[in-house]
């Protein structure tokens, strides 16, 4: 399989950034296909820490082409700020190595403000968004009123498109008793941004099709996780886009046959940020210990992540909905030293055992985990780079996960460092 898709197999924050960076050495192109700057990656390369939000991880690899696809929602100011920050760290970013889909939807200040207003209106209705305007921007995209990157190149039609957008947003603001946005101010802002952004604009579907026909390897980089998918996740506590592997095609303009190998990333335990069901959550000393050892705080928001035992039911479900061929298991080292480790192998709902997470919000909140206890290990797995360096019991744990989720482990990560990775099966050669 020439191309590889990387998706999160849990609720995001699984360590996709490191795995994508590690795989990007073998790729010619790294393409983002959904989400926005709400999904943070932390990469450690030769002791230097890089934090990415909107940019594909491929920008850290010289000679690689990074692409932001049409399925992404694109915040111009966040983009420019991230480019500036990484440039100060010595990363070369220019239109030569980064292209942005000309039909990508823009996130504007009015989207961020609306997102925050909704999220802070009531704790009862809060979803746990990052308040960065992601959801409102996707709403405008579906509502056919969004401003897209290509619109900045047509100054004659841009004012009309802004007026159309404000017809909707100012009606909302009047209902909320807020001052209306002025079209002139938005036009001035976008006109000033245009010369900084348009050099990156590209007909991405055509570019990728040409590269594919030339035999170039494409690595599709997903954001967040499959359990946050707007259709297949824990609705309504989800993101506003499709995060499953099939979106790699839609979000870049490629055909489904171009996707290739699907690599699912999951931690050796489970975490979640924000609201929503979490069957294996540990609201106790063990959960806090996992969080502290794993440094479980959001890259973008700094919010502490909720922590719990590995949930084989959920990962098995995402293996199916994403068509995952192999898993990359991360943060195995965080479980070093635990005498016993619990793994969720099923659920109990209203007295009955079930083998999947139900779609209903109420049922999701009522499921109880059924655990299997596995003996832990005392020897360290941290920084291991081969199976021979792993404790026997840690290997048994990995093998049991493979059995429970019905999918082999292709990669094993034992630290944030790029090189601390054990390769079982190369996704590009599978």
Swiss-Prot record:
Residues reported in the UniProt entry to bind substrate: 299-305
Cofactor: Mg(2+)
Binding site for GTP: 12-18, 40-42, 305, 331-333, 413-415
Chain sites annotated for binding IMP: 13-16, 38-41, 130, 144, 224, 239, 303
CDD domains the UniProt entry points to: AdSS (cd03108)
Enzyme category, top tier: ligase
Main location: cytoplasm
Name of the protein in question: Adenylosuccinate synthetase
Originating species: Rhodopseudomonas palustris (strain HaA2)
Lineage: Bacteria, Pseudomonadati, Pseudomonadota, Alphaproteobacteria, Hyphomicrobiales
């Amino acid at each position: 399989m020439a191309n590889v898709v990387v998706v999160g197999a849990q609720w995001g924050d699984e360590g996709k950034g490191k795995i994508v960076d590690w795989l990007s050495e073998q790729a010619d192109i790294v393409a983002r296909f959904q989400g926005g700057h709400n999904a943070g990656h932390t990469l450690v390369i030769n002791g230097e820490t890089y934090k990415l939000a909107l940019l594909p991880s491929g920008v850290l690899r010289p000679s690689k082409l990074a692409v932001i696809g049409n399925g992404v929602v694109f915040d111009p100011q966040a983009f420019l700020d991230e480019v500036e920050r990484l440039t100060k760290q010595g990363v070369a970013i220019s239109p030569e190595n980064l292209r942005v889909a000309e039909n990508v939807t823009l996130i504007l200040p009015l989207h961020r403000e609306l997102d925050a207003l909704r999220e802070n209106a009531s704790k009862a209705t809060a979803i746990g968004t990052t308040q960065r305007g992601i959801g409102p921007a996707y709403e405008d995209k579906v509502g056919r009123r969004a401003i897209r990157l290509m619109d900045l190149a047509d100054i004659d039609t841009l004012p009309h498109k802004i007026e159309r957008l404000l017809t909707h947003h100012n009606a909302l603001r009047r209902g909320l008793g807020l001052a209306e946005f002025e079209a002139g101010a938005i036009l001035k802002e976008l006109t000033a941004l245009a010369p900084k952004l348009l050099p990156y604009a590209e007909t991405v579907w055509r570019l990728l099709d040409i590269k594919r026909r030339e035999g170039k390897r494409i690595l599709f980089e997903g954001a967040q996780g499959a359990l946050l998918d707007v259709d297949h996740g824990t609705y309504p506590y989800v993101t506003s886009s499709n995060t499953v592997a099939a979106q790699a095609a839609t979000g870049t303009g490629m055909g489904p046959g171009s996707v290739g190998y699907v690599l699912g990333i999951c931690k050796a335990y489970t975490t979640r940020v924000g609201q929503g069901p979490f069957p294996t959550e540990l609201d106790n000393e063990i959960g806090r210990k996992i969080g502290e050892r794993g440094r479980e705080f959001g890259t973008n928001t700094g919010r502490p992540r909720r922590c719990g035992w590995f949930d084989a039911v959920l990962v098995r479900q995402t293996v199916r909905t994403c068509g995952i061929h192999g898993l990359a298991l991360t943060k195995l080292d965080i479980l070093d030293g635990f005498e016993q480790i619990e793994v969720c192998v099923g659920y109990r709902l209203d007295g009955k055992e079930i083998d999947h997470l139900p779609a209903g919000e109420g049922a999701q909140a009522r499921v109880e985990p059924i655990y299997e206890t596995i003996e832990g290990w005392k020897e360290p797995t941290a920084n291991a780079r081969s199976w021979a360096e792993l404790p026997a019991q840690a290997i048994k744990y990995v093998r049991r996960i493979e059995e429970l989720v019905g999918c082999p482990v292709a990669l094993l990560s034992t630290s944030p460092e790029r090189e601390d990775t054990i390769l079982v099966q190369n996704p590009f050669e599978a």
